[in-house]
Design a protein with these regions (language model features):
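C-terminal GPI-anchoring signal of eukaryotic secretory precursors
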Residues: 232-236, 240-284
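Structured recognition/catalytic domains enriched at protein termini
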Residues: 29-218
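Cys/His-clustered metal-coordination modules, chiefly Zn-binding fingers
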Residues: 220, 224, 229, 237, ...
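Fungal secretory targeting signals
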Residues: 1-36, 273-295
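Residue-level signal for mature regions of secreted extracellular proteins and peptides
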Residues: 136, 177, 213, 226-227, ...
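Secreted/processed peptides and extracellular or luminal domains of membrane proteins
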Residues: 149, 190, 226-227, 239, ...
Length: 295
């Protein structure tokens, strides 16, 4: 299985980036315009973890080269729903974040694309023992010949929830063992069956709005009403991908990088030293330090 690990992107190259992403995506669009795009929350799962100041929240796009047709967006909320003693927590607004840069991600030439908030942009602090819920909403664009005849395209959305427990004597975060050889009971992703693609007229806008298409290219997806069954267990994070993710978490949100909310970045060459890039073991150590500081 191929994973997406592009090179870091600087702010100075953002315009070039948009052109290259558009060009590469357009070539891919010509060759393949139908299939099932699946989006899964692969970490955390419905399991128990030690308290940590930062718990990675990682999504996987399967058949990801088709994702640009959907102009994808993900919104994430995290709630403490039960205290460790079984009582109900005092109400507080959810910790939230949007992966708004997904619509410009380079999904091309990859079977699987990982998307996640990087450390400095992650608002989630799973430091309190108890039962938590991570609720995520996948939002995607669709169009039909009839809708485009009326100069509109439509957004659909689907919401999923994962329940996890935070407890002091539980396992530390390990992305490799935490996603390999595991059952996915209670996990459910979103699968969208693209049957065709259509050209978007320049006059088209979102239904009920005046805003125009902001995604890559000028092609949108036509989908079926039947919903394919998702299979989150198909995706795991191997050591190489975990190392890349650890570096992205550590360095991917700095001012030198264009994408601050979605990232599958490989560490820059000058960050790959022992001092600059965490190994897989170092990733566990990073979260372990956060956990230790919370005890």
């Amino acid at each position: 299985m191929a994973y997406h690990v592009p090179v870091p992107i600087t702010l100075g190259t953002s315009l070039t980036l948009h052109f290259l992403v558009f060009s590469a995506t357009w070539v891919k669009m010509v060759g393949a315009s139908s299939g099932v795009v699946e989006v899964d929350l692969i970490f955390p799962r419905n399991e128990t973890y030690a308290p940590t100041a930062y718990l990675p929240i990682i999504f996987a796009f399967q058949n990801s080269h088709l994702a640009p047709f959907l102009d994808p967006l993900i919104h994430i909320d995290a709630y403490l729903v039960q205290n460790a003693n079984g009582s109900t927590p005092q109400w507080a607004p959810p910790e939230s974040i949007d992966l708004e840069q997904l619509r410009w991600a380079n999904f091309t030439n990859n079977d699987t694309y990982f998307a996640y908030p990087t450390y400095q942009r992650n608002e989630f602090t799973f430091a309190t023992e108890g039962i938590w819920q991570v609720t995520w909403t996948f939002n995607w664009a669709v169009c039909t010949e009839d809708s485009l005849a009326n100069n509109i395209f439509i957004r659909n959305e689907s919401q999923r929830t994962t329940t996890l427990t935070i407890r002091k004597d539980a396992q530390e975060v390990d992305l490799v063992s935490g996603t390999m050889g595991k059952s996915c009971s209670g996990q459910d992703g979103v699968a969208v069956n693209i049957t065709n693609t259509l050209h978007i007229p320049s006059s088209a806008h979102w239904e009920g709005q005046t805003d125009k298409w902001e995604g890559q290219g000028d092609i949108c997806a036509s989908t079926t009403s039947s919903v394919p069954k998702s299979d989150p267990c198909r995706v795991s994070i191997d050591p190489a991908a975990a190392a890349s993710i650890s570096c992205s978490i550590t360095f991917g949100s700095s001012a030198a990088n264009f994408s601050t909310t979605t990232s599958s970045l490989t560490c820059p060459e000058d960050k790959k030293s022992a001092a600059g890039c965490l190994t897989v073991g170092g990733l566990a150590a990073l979260f372990g330090v956060f956990s230790y500081l919370l005890h």
